[in-house]
Amino acid sequence: MKISVKTLKGSTFQIEVDSAQKVADVKRIIETTQGQHIYPAEQQMLIHQGKVLKDDTTLDENKVLENSFLVIMLRQGKGSSSSAPATSKAPSNQAPPTQTVPAAPASQAPVAPATTVPVTVSAPTPTATASPAPAVAVSSEADNYGQATSNLVAGSNLEATIQSILEMGGGIWDRDIVLHALSAAFNNPERAVEYLYSGVPEQMDIPVPPPSIQPANPTQASQATQPAAPSILSSGPNASPLDLFPQALPNASTDAAGLGNLDALRNNAQFRTLLSLVQANPQILQPLLQELGKQNPQILQLIQENQAEFLHLINEPAEGDDEENLLDQFPEAMPQTIAVTPEENEAILRLEAMGFDRALVLDVFFACNKDEQLAANYLLDHMNEFDDEGPP
């Protein structure tokens, strides 16, 4: 019999199966027909009428009939985040080289298996070139692009993803719960579905202090008062803290406490950069405030005591006649050279492979505290602005 298989992005394909076949066999059929690099059987999760199908059960036992449809998603395997094309690694019998990568080189440099790799963040000159590097196959760049974009949705695709997840649940979830899971997963549909089945990690499920006045922006109000779904697990792919606040901010908190308001924070370039990210993507406000409470409770207390001024900071436009993006201030606030690990350098290359300028990628990557998914989400959400106005 023929059944349809839907993806979270809305695409559909058909496969020929037998009702007596086990779910594990169906996964292998999908792997064979669609490609092992796209849908590896061991990472597949098949869902029918809101139920995750077990490998040792048959289609008949799960009431999968002719012309039924399954929803497919991929589990985030341990090796998926660290995987990289073999051509990008140096031979193991050579001494680990150290490289300095310009902010916008003419060609990619190899990823070295050293513990840290210095990356120059300062603005490049048009003639800047990288040290000679072995050519990377075109197919590996395509793989990098797929890895960076396949798990994120934004813009018009977001509504289609919400509807797809609602259909997947077969009515067991309402829209608010799905939106909450997507918010906690930073618009990663696969991770959001995992949260719906296993619970949103405690680190991502926090209340925001209730404002004492009506916010100027209704969107900000809806984000601040969004109801929390039941939290079950304290572990998961997004369980690690976001550490969105750099080391320069503790001094700012001391100055701000002396003033009794947010003037010191208003003039802090890094804090202004974080505010610009919140303005662009209000969904990060909750985890940002949570991490602020962990790393600098004095600033969080100051924000709670000056909620009206904080809301004004969030809603006010960027300063300057040309309304320059606040990310322009980030290179001035950070050291000119920052050491990154090989894994972080691979993340930078994957973001570059999406077609963005390297200087822009570095600015956003470090502004998002080296969170690859958050940086990719920001770049995708604002790609039209970058095309029209150039990099910030």
UniProtKB/Swiss-Prot annotation:
**Keywords carried by this UniProt record:** DNA damage, DNA repair, Nucleus, Repeat
Gene Ontology biological process terms, A to Z:
nucleotide-excision repair; proteasome-mediated ubiquitin-dependent protein catabolic process
An example of a Pfam family matching this protein is XPC-binding
Q: Where is the UBA domain?
A: 156-199, 342-382
Residues that span the membrane, as ranges: none
One GO cellular component term, please give it.
nucleoplasm
Cross-referenced InterPro entries: Rad23, STI1_HS-bd, UBA, UBA-like_sf, Ubiquitin-like_dom, Ubiquitin-like_domsf, XPC-bd, XPC-bd_sf
What segments bear the compositional bias annotation Low complexity? 214-231
Using the record's annotation, list all stretches that form the Ubiquitin-like domain: 1-79
Q: Main subcellular localization, coarse class?
A: nucleus
Question: Which intervals of the chain are annotated as region Disordered?
Answer: 80-109, 209-237
Gene Ontology molecular function terms on file: damaged DNA binding; polyubiquitin modification-dependent protein binding; proteasome binding; ubiquitin binding
| Tissue expr | Mostly expressed in vegetative tissues.
Q: Where is the STI1 domain?
A: 260-303
Keyword DNA repair attributed: yes
Q: Would the keyword Ribosomal protein turn up in this protein's UniProt record? A: no
Query: What compartments host this protein?
Result: Nucleus
Q: What does this protein do?
A: May be involved in nucleotide excision repair. Binds and presumably selects ubiquitin-conjugates for destruction. Prefers multiubiquitin chains rather than single ubiquitins, with a binding affinity for 'Lys-48'-linked ubiquitin chains. Acts as a ubiquitin receptor that associates with the 26S proteasomal docking subunit RPN10 for the indirect recognition of ubiquitinated substrates of ubiquitin/26S proteasome-mediated proteolysis (UPP).
Q: Which family does it belong to?
A: Belongs to the RAD23 family.
Q: Tell me the subunit arrangement.
A: Interacts with 'Lys-48'-linked polyubiquitin chains. Interacts with RPN10. Interacts with VP1.
Q: What is this protein called?
A: Probable ubiquitin receptor RAD23
Protein encoded by which gene = RAD23
